[in-house]
């Protein structure tokens, strides 16, 4: 992302730290923001555990340490590892986590409004997760009609997974489903593309790209993807056409619940009771 996307809380944390630890590529974006005398520890790729260990080592010396990640550190970032390491080591070091703007959020803003309804995020990296599990998640997302953001779509040694994802989505979605992808979101090299599921070319995607696949309601307006919330058009009409029975049930449940003399019934038993009374109309 860009410097403008750094939240004030994150900026304050960076500027109040004695030590900054992170992947060496990220320092190019924040070095000019650091206060004088800040110690910077940079490491290469796949050195996450070493970075976490260094962070605890410096913190044990009484220093304020900031571990940086791109986007939101809690989304495929360093935050989970830091908390896991604290648990495993029994450390008493205090941890504070600050939210950031994740790559899929930045990409979505550049593409229009593609995640206006239910969505999920899937990483295609099988470094930590077996591909069999990733494929199950892909199939579930496609079948459930989620707008789907794709992280880590390709790498130097991993290319076929995106082809497989496209194949799986085409089993559940129409070929004309809008798809957007953004390379280097928020950076000078930024590129924004809109296409369809059928025309998505995995060869145009690299490791710095985030892909967003629309759901069955997503449409294109110019170069923008829009996933409606349901205020207009087909979704609202479908709700009117199919929601009568559901509306009756909801109103019935509310009426029954108000009439219950015992309001302290455990929720699992109350749920079964509401169903039974509603079904028999015994109220």
Predicted regions and their residues:
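Class I S-adenosyl-L-methionine
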Residues: 1-95, 201, 238-271, 275
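A contiguous loop/helix-start segment that scaffolds small-molecule binding in enzyme catalytic cores
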Residues: 64-65, 143-251, 275
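Class I SAM-dependent methyltransferase SAM-binding "motif I" and its flanking Rossmann-like core
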Residues: 75-144
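Conserved beta-strand scaffold positions in the cores of enzyme catalytic domains, especially
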Residues: 40-42, 95-97, 121, 179-181
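Short gly/ser/thr-rich secondary-structure transition/capping motifs
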Residues: 1-5, 128-131, 193-195
């Amino acid at each position: 992302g860009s410097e403008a996307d750094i939240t004030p809380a994150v900026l304050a944390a960076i500027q109040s730290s004695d030590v900054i630890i992170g992947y060496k590529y990220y320092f190019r974006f924040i070095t000019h923001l650091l206060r004088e005398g800040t110690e910077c520890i940079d490491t290469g790729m796949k050195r996450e555990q070493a970075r976490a260990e260094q962070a605890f080592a410096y913190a044990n010396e009484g220093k304020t340490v900031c571990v940086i990640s791109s986007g939101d550190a809690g989304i495929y970032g360093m935050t989970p590892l830091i908390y896991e390491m604290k648990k495993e080591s029994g450390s008493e070091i205090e941890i504070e986590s600050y939210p950031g703007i994740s790559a899929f959020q930045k990409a979505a803003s550049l593409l229009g409004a593609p995640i206006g309804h239910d969505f999920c995020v899937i990483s295609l990296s099988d470094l930590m997760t077996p591909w069999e599990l990733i494929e199950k998640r892909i199939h579930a997302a496609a079948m459930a009609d989620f707008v789907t953001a794709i992280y880590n779509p390709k790498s130097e040694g991993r290319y076929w997974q995106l082809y497989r994802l496209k194949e799986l989505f085409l089993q559940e979605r129409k070929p004309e489903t809008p798809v957007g992808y953004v390379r280097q979101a928020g950076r000078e090299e930024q590129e924004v593309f809109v296409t369809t599921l059928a025309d998505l070319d995995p060869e145009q995607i690299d490791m710095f790209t985030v892909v967003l696949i629309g759901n069955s309601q997503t449409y294109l307006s110019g170069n923008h993807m829009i996933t409606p919330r349901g205020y207009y058009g087909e979704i609202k009409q479908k709700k009117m056409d199919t929601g009568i029975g559901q509306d009756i049930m909801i109103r019935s449940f509310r009426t029954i619940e108000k009439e219950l003399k015992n309001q302290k019934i455990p929720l699992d038993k109350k749920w079964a009771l509401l169903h039974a009374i509603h079904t028999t109309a015994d109220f």
